[in-house]
Amino acid sequence: MEVHEMGKITILKDKLIFERRDELTVIEAYGENCLRCRSTKNSKLLDENWTLLPPASESECFVEGDEKVATIRNGMVSATIEAGQPWYGGIISYYRKDRQILHTKFEGEYTGRNVHTEGDHYQIKVIFDANEGEHFYGLGQEQENQFDRKGSTCNLQHYNTKSAVPVVYSSFGYGFLWNNPAPGRCETTNNHTMWVADSAYQADYLIYAGETPADVLKIYCDLTGYAPKFPEWAAGFWQSKLRYESQEDLLEVAREYKKRGIPITAIVIDYFHWTEQGEWKFDPEYWPDPAAMCRELKEMKIEPVVSIWPTINPKSENYEEMNEANMLVRTENGQYGTFEFYGQQTFIDVTHPKTGSFVWDKVKENYYKYGIRTFWLDEAEPEVHPQQYSNLKFYAGNGAQSAMLYPYYYSKMFYEGLKSEGETDIILLTRAAYPGTQKFGSLVWNGDIMSTFEALRMSVKTGLSMAMSGIPWWNSDIGGFLEGDIESDYFKELVVRWAQFGVFSPVMRLHGSRLRTKNQKDRHPDVKERSGGDNEIWSFGEENYKILKGLVELRERLRPYICHYMDLASETGAPIMRPMFFDYYEDEVCYTLEDQYMFGEDILFAPISAQGQTGREVYLPEGSWIDVNTKEVYEGKKWVTCTAQLHQFIAFVREGSNVINVF
């Protein structure tokens, strides 16, 4: 039987086009050392970039070949596509320099990669062969024990404690960005690497390479944006709890910190300070004079931070107008409610162009004019129940095709509002992230996690994963969020170990919903959402207070060091909290380390994250390292055994660095 070749390759100046029945694929240069591939079953490609920025630089592109085989090279990265045989054509191989890093894998014939969902949308799969010995890092944050993503799967969807940032860094020296906001899945398993969009018009991904992890991360930031300049005050200590029920409650705590001489730079006003969900203003019964409150806080050099929720219900004075103007997330079927919390709530549609100015006008009138410049963007996923994305209707499209965009536009809305008022020091505490949110000053935390040592261990890996996902501003609730018993020995130990981790996090923030104590007084019996247990550093016993006060004071001494590296993150994309392999990428051991990390280039921190633990093994990379407790100097490229009682932590400083003087 005669076999006819299937498909045709067209070579243009800076791209390759492959066409055959039910497939159109374009591979093109995109900035420096980067290739972009788009592929669809439809007859044409869309020019939709989602959150991708235009190329930051001109491409050094070279193309060659014919209708059967062609290659495109852009600096360090190249791709070769083969027209191939019927049903198995269109094979793509990607290279970093001369090393193959990705190779298309067929699991069944090629049309099986596109399964029709609705209209011109499909469930789309992009599958590559697995590489032996490869490590993957990134994919956002999730409370689990997997830092190296090799051998695992990841659902690409947001929920409380999970931000799906669909980007990975490979130990083979390249990055991969899945440019598709549809919920889906990523499998970096031992038999294949597969990216899935549950419902999309086209596949869209970028592959980029560099000499070092820092080079690769910089290209990612060229593609999606750099964090703005980090506000100096934000490098200090943040005080928070669920929740201060009134203006006076909050001011009492702020005054006590100042009275005790404890350095504090921010205090947080949590949810239900408002009149109703979707009204974005203080309840005057409990917050009678926000202007005076803000003046007093700023005189104490404490920044007020206010929680904003994107939820709204028919009781809100803004509901009718927003609903009629389609500024709310709608449902394809059934009632409007997508979240049950003090009644059925829906969410504002932050992807709608009118929503930003409408909500910002309310925020400006009810918060900004009083002196509030920093906002806590909670519920940023958004948290819908059940998670049936195809039933959600956004301005940007059906939820099955666009739901992952929500935290991007939520952050963008407040960033642009603040910029329009001339603000430059912008930081937004946000519960979810997506590629590009970092450029809006989004400080991500890992959500409502448990108050357990297991959650602390996971949080270390979470922070490192976010660093390799291009999110340099990250933090966690010191002590965890849920079920913390401040009277228990377990929690008293936990909060100290977590605070030690907090000192060496991009932001140090004490927060949580502590269990109420037996004799806790109801200060405001009629309040809708009452406070949990106390959560100030003096709330956990006298011995803990001494330790925690010392840690907060250490954080204050570290502020110049922290600000230096946060500035570098804004300029280069390099995070202050970074995996060991980020700087020591030629040391194979460093790719296996998931419970110690570098804090900038000069501090190595090894958290203690198990109950009763007072010692652990630490790997020191090349160079000479000073133990901050004993001041003993160790030579690197070896493991050392360290001890640290509860009042101590394990950290090393690179010999020759002046930062040793703050310890």
Features from the language model and the residues they span:
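Secondary-structure transition/capping motifs at alpha-helix termini
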Residues: A227-F230, K258-A266, P288-V305, R330, ...
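Aromatic-lined carbohydrate-binding/catalytic grooves of carbohydrate-active enzymes
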Residues: P228-L392, Q438
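The substrate-binding groove and active-site-proximal loops of carbohydrate-active enzymes
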Residues: D204-A209, A234-Q247, W274-P288, E340-W360, ...
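Acidic, His- and aromatic-enriched active-site or binding-groove loops in soluble protein domains
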Residues: Y286-E296, I302, E321-Y342, Y395-S411, ...
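A low-complexity, Ser/Thr/Gly/Pro-enriched, surface-exposed linker/loop concept
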Residues: E2-I9, K13, E28-A70, N114
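Catalytic and substrate-binding clefts that recognize carbohydrates or anionic sugar/phosphate headgroups
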Residues: F18-R20, C61-P231, K241-L242, Q247, ...
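Catalytic core of carbohydrate-active enzymes
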Residues: Y415-I426, A433-W445, M466-S476, F481-F663
